[in-house]
Amino acid sequence: MKLPSVASLLIRVYRTTGPVSHIQRIRHGAVLNKNYSSVSAVKNCTALLYRNHGEPSQVVQLESLDLPQVGAECVLVKMLAAPINPSDLNMLQGTYAILPELPAVGGNEGVAQVMEVGDKVKTLKVGDWVIPKDAGIGTWRTAAVLKADDLVTLPKDIPVLSAATLGVNPCTAYRMLTDFEELKAGDTVIQNAANSGVGQAVIQIAAAKGIHTINVIRDRPDLRQLSDRLTAMGATHVITEETLRRPEMKELFKSCPRPKLALNGVGGKSATELLRHLQSGGSLVTYGGMAKQPVTVPVSALIFKDVRVRGFWVTQWKRDNRHDDEALRHMLDELCILIRAGKLSAPICTQVQLQDFRKALENAMKPYVSTKQVFVM
Amino acid sequence: MKLPSVASLLIRVYRTTGPVSHIQRIRHGAVLNKNYSSVSAVKNCTALLYRNHGEPSQVVQLESLDLPQVGAECVLVKMLAAPINPSDLNMLQGTYAILPELPAVGGNEGVAQVMEVGDKVKTLKVGDWVIPKDAGIGTWRTAAVLKADDLVTLPKDIPVLSAATLGVNPCTAYRMLTDFEELKAGDTVIQNAANSGVGQAVIQIAAAKGIHTINVIRDRPDLRQLSDRLTAMGATHVITEETLRRPEMKELFKSCPRPKLALNGVGGKSATELLRHLQSGGSLVTYGGMAKQPVTVPVSALIFKDVRVRGFWVTQWKRDNRHDDEALRHMLDELCILIRAGKLSAPICTQVQLQDFRKALENAMKPYVSTKQVFVM
């Protein structure tokens, strides 16, 4: 599968306004033009480019790229902040389900400020904060010319780190809590990888709705500290993978009902154990596979317990809802209300400069990382 | 889980009409009463009873049981024919999801004729053909007193073997083809265990609707003969498990689209391979686990291909629709139309007498059995 839409649209936009230069080789949102004389105040940008797949910190380079003129339906944006997500790393490694043509700029998420708008743009104005509607923008850069239709505004009264990390993890958490089971206050959700970006958002969004969460994490040196942090966020129970497999789990179900929904970011045994604790007719939704093992489902759970096994990919959801701006708008508004109310915080972040990318990428690859690397431009 | 409804209802009915004798020990539909003087023409029956779980042919015994009086809401029926299904064997072995209290009469499916009706029965009349609405009747017997509400009529113009085998396998096939994906003529369904009772019904019902079927069977001595038989029934393609795993499968998809629906009666590798051939967004529905191995689903199939993994159990469907007679009636009517049109035949059956039960049970346990054992009373 090749990355469609954003990058190819940009190239099409560019082609209508000027001669084709070597931009055709750069498809991943990084549109540059050494031959074109732009009227924009910002004529170039610094970006984290990769020309080959491989070890993330090795294949990425910091480069200066020229920007094209701002076409009638485009905007010039200054990037404010952009995180390193696990899917970005998989893209660099060449193992993700969608891969841009190379060379490409890394990063699929982030918040930017509009600096200049094309003549026909009605939806955005200078100063607006925007995030990409879809993956494929190439967000690890200081500035970009983007099609206005590929962006959606965010209010400027939320923290910049919340804005930069809103479009992937909290949206994934929100949709998984909304689209698979009808959950109401008092219901229970169980999840593994509870310390991931998605996991933390699940805890907070569920808590805001009065939904119990049983949160499974791997045993680790700072277990108590992490457990306390998740509990402070609103987690009902925090348990280790080992506890998940023990008979004493039944004690836990004296204080909350068996879960209707299980969220799986791990796979393997962990997923099978989540399933085991589900209510009859409940759903297991997989959004990640950290353990690199498949999801194994006993036949009896399917036939006699009617468990439903599904997957979720926020990129696909955004594409399926590409022409329904209301659905995306409604979700972002709800999440921003939670952020303003102090009920949904950004994950703990380490802010890094673009030039420190090698260390940031290496840190993002380490196991048991409890902080998200975010480029701040 | 204990068998509810039918048997316990019968006992409740009996209790309103006469003294309680040792019938309380027989909960599995087999209601008998040595102390009661019945006004029915038929006062007792012969039944295949089991008092312990174990090897089917060893634990079953042929016994004579007295029948209770026909209560106001009950009917006396003469059993005409009743098959041995895999789930019946699992019940005898004690490995099924629902198990009756022992002693119990074996068998959960079959067709009977009404011989006498209670005063308050409006839905049935003498001479009607009836089948049970739910599992738990104990059908391997010559006669029974049953609650009218637990029975549904079938037209008498279909073959008795079709009637005796309609309620489980064809109903399972019909619902799986109806409830999980919206299938239209030209779509494809893939299934393993294509030679099972359910598999044969799937082939015929799908063919009647113009739906392609890809039918996977195990390699065996009479492969060609079996393949020809399934093709004559309407199978689009018949392949072996080995072929299912080979690259030449893509040749097959030149003549029919990739399946929206995969039906799994096997589990293990076979189920994973069915999944691999599904369309994006398609469903794998498991109704059996002949291989005694779980269903293993790659994480990427869930996240990036949005495959949906579900289970189906016709007994649960019947219970969920217990108070919606229309749903059951509509399905049976549709199936009877197919039977009359020569589009849905009973599986190849071996008719046996109740007294030959040991040999019948042994035959039903053999692998690669291509004929269903049916008791004819």
Curated annotation (Swiss-Prot), chains A, B:
GO biological process, one term: fatty acid biosynthetic process
Subcellular compartments: Mitochondrion
Residues bound to NADP(+): 169, 195-198, 218-220, 287-290, 312-314, 372
CDD domains assigned: ETR
Active site residues of this protein: Y96
Transit peptide: 1-52
Protein's UniProt keywords contain Mitochondrion: yes
GO molecular function, one term: enoyl-[acyl-carrier-protein] reductase (NADPH) activity
Domain of life: Eukaryota
Keywords: Fatty acid biosynthesis, Fatty acid metabolism, Lipid biosynthesis, Lipid metabolism, Mitochondrion, NADP, Oxidoreductase, Transit peptide
GO annotations of cellular component type: mitochondrion
Enzyme Commission number(s) of this protein: 1.3.1.104
Catalytic reaction annotation: a 2,3-saturated acyl-[ACP] + NADP(+) = a (2E)-enoyl-[ACP] + NADPH + H(+)
SMART domains linked: PKS_ER
The protein's role, per its UniProt record: Catalyzes the NADPH-dependent reduction of trans-2-enoyl thioesters in mitochondrial fatty acid synthesis (fatty acid synthesis type II). Fatty acid chain elongation in mitochondria uses acyl carrier protein (ACP) as an acyl group carrier, but the enzyme accepts both ACP and CoA thioesters as substrates in vitro. May provide the octanoyl chain used for lipoic acid biosynthesis, regulating protein lipoylation and mitochondrial respiratory activity. Involved in iron homeostasis; affecting Fe-S cluster assembly and ceramide metabolism.
Oligomer status and interactors: Homodimer.
Family: Belongs to the zinc-containing alcohol dehydrogenase family. Quinone oxidoreductase subfamily.
Protein name from the UniProt record: Enoyl-[acyl-carrier-protein] reductase, mitochondrial
